[in-house]
């Protein structure tokens, strides 16, 4: 029994220990509840703050239009061309000024971007027209936000900026989102998607927004030809697309990279075919199409730049042809827009006996490979052949016209040379 006494003592200790642990657990549980309550309150506050922030600074944006005269910059006619070096240099200067203005202000977290949308003339000096984009905050006090942006910009322009701003010419107003986005995307030859490679016959799928000037000409809801957007009203395409049907009522236009999901569909108001085009000859294979209503520019719908009549696209330079044409002669048409990188071939080579034997005239140009591989094909007709300059701007060099089948050796694609018809385009469209 003597060995039983420690056991009773052990039992007493165990019971005491259990009671002590129980009390400790109760205390920890109470502390845990307090801690949990504090954490819950903090998380709730953070969540409410985030909700409040996104309610005040959501996906919507504020847009403003500003214009002002600059007294120390003489107007140059080249400012009328958004792709000219003079225009781009001036735009860069204005955008830098806007960035500096708002990045150094209390609006720096809301400021998104600025862009010069037009340069006009007043008494021999330039007038800047720009659009500003801000995150939409202070929704309950739009006027206060408007005044804050205006005051910040006006005070900056009055100071030492390197530009002599005529303060009396300063104008500031808000602008609706669709119009603002149209203006922000109005520059020709620009795109938001960077190409990853090119393969049309022997081609490769394009990405959404990669070739935003590409349009589909549809007769009775069926894709017949490609076309290129050159303004918010005008498209340019091949005359031979209309040899069987030239009534505008029979045609529709859509954009986007999927034929199955057309974007911005438009009716056709007018079709103007070159007066000297005569099928089956290939000369003067050019036409312009006027839309019934203008398209609004956005990231996926933009215009290509029209080259000047004197602009050169040298032999062996890279160009890209796009379209929904068949992937091989007499093949099926794809749903996804196709792209193909080819090279310009000089007319002398293209007119050789092995190639087209003298059929290439000055109003035509060849592009592709003498070995074949990549080429435009049926259904690509009227679509763009575009060239990228050193500044990353895309110009319309050619219009898909004709060829001997698709991607055959010594039979590259033949295109209408846009520079040759530049004056004709201006006479019909004013562009």
Swiss-Prot record:
What changing residue 196 to A does, per the record, is: Strongly reduced autocatalytic cleavage. Strongly reduced autocatalytic cleavage. Slightly reduced autocatalytic cleavage
Pfam families, sorted = SEA (PF01390), Trypsin (PF00089)
A GO cellular component annotation here is: dendrite
Bilayer-crossing residues are 34-54
Q: Where in the cell is it found?
A: Cell membrane; Cell projection, Dendrite; Perikaryon
Domain Peptidase S1: start-end pairs: 200-430
SEA domain: from which residue to which, for each copy?
60-177
- Residues assigned to the Extracellular compartment are 55-431
Membrane-side (Cytoplasmic) residue stretches = 1-33
An example of a GO molecular function for this protein is: serine-type endopeptidase activity
Topology relative to the lipid bilayer, per the entry, is: Single-pass type II membrane protein
Q: Where is the active site?
A: 240, 285, 381
This chain's function reads: Serine protease which has a preference for Arg or Lys in position P1 and uncharged residues in positions P2 and P3. Shows specificity towards FGF2 in vitro.
Give the family per the record.
Belongs to the peptidase S1 family.
The name under which this protein is listed is: Transmembrane protease serine 11C
Q: What is the lineage of its organism?
A: Eukaryota, Metazoa, Chordata, Craniata, Vertebrata
